[in-house]
């Protein structure tokens, strides 16, 4: 999982990337290709 300040470029890496908020943190997850995971922080 990558930790980045800005998730805008990370959500454009793949067509299926979704931005999710969990427990006050923002994540990018991808169900089809799980290597595109990131957390903001």
From Swiss-Prot:
Record Pfam families: Ribosomal_L36 (PF00444)
InterPro entries registered for this protein in UniProt: Ribosomal_bL36 (IPR000473), Ribosomal_bL36_sp (IPR035977), Ribosomal_L36_bact (IPR047621)
Superkingdom of this protein's organism: Bacteria
Keyword terms: Ribonucleoprotein, Ribosomal protein
Keyword Ribonucleoprotein: yes
Keyword Membrane: no
GO MF terms, alphabetically ordered: structural constituent of ribosome
One GO cellular component term: ribosome
GO terms, biological process: translation
PANTHER family referenced in this protein's UniProt entry, alphabetically: 50S RIBOSOMAL PROTEIN L36 2 (PTHR47781), LARGE RIBOSOMAL SUBUNIT PROTEIN BL36B (PTHR47781:SF1)
UniProt record similarity statement: Belongs to the bacterial ribosomal protein bL36 family.
Protein name: Large ribosomal subunit protein bL36
Organism lineage string: Bacteria, Pseudomonadati, Pseudomonadota, Alphaproteobacteria, Sphingomonadales
Name of the gene encoding the protein in the UniProt record: rpmJ
């Amino acid at each position: 999982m990558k930790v980045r300040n800005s998730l805008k470029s990370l959500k454009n890496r793949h067509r299926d990337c979704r931005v999710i908020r969990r427990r006050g943190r923002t994540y990018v997850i991808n169900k089809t290709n799980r290597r595109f995971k990131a957390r903001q922080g």
